[in-house]
Amino acid sequence: GAVPCGKDGRQCRNHADCCNCCPIGTCAPSTNWILPGCSTGPFMTR
């Protein structure tokens, strides 16, 4: 499932599509050492 992210609302389907994303499409900051770009919570880039 893609989720809108970024200020232009592009669809985020995979890592670095428009922001850092988990495989499931959750946008997240790149602070997870084990799964870079993944997080348990949503994150909208500015």
From Swiss-Prot:
Kindly list the GO molecular function terms attached to this UniProt entry.
Answer: sodium channel regulator activity; toxin activity
What keywords does the record list, in alphabetical order? Answer: D-amino acid, Disulfide bond, Ion channel impairing toxin, Neurotoxin, Secreted, Toxin, Voltage-gated sodium channel impairing toxin
What domain of life?
Answer: Eukaryota
Which residues, in ranges, are excised as the propeptide? 46
Q: Which InterPro entries match?
A: Conotoxin-I_CS, Toxin_19
Which Gene3D superfamilies does the record associate with it? 4.10.40.80
Q: Which GO terms describe its cellular component?
A: extracellular region
Intrachain S-S bonds: C5-C19, C12-C22, C18-C27, C21-C38
Q: Which residues form the signal peptide?
A: none
The entry's localization annotation reads: Secreted
Q: Name one Pfam family in it.
A: Toxin_19
Primary location group? secreted
Please describe the organ and tissue distribution of this protein's expression. Expressed by the venom duct.
D-methionine modified-residue sites:
M44
Q: Which family does it belong to?
A: Belongs to the conotoxin I1 superfamily.
* Function comment: Iota-conotoxins bind to voltage-gated sodium channels (Nav) and act as agonists by shifting the voltage-dependence of activation to more hyperpolarized levels. Produces general excitatory symptoms.
Free-text comment on this protein's domains from its UniProt entry: The cysteine framework is XI (C-C-CC-CC-C-C).
What is the protein named?
A: Iota-conotoxin-like R11.2
Native source organism of the sequence: Conus radiatus
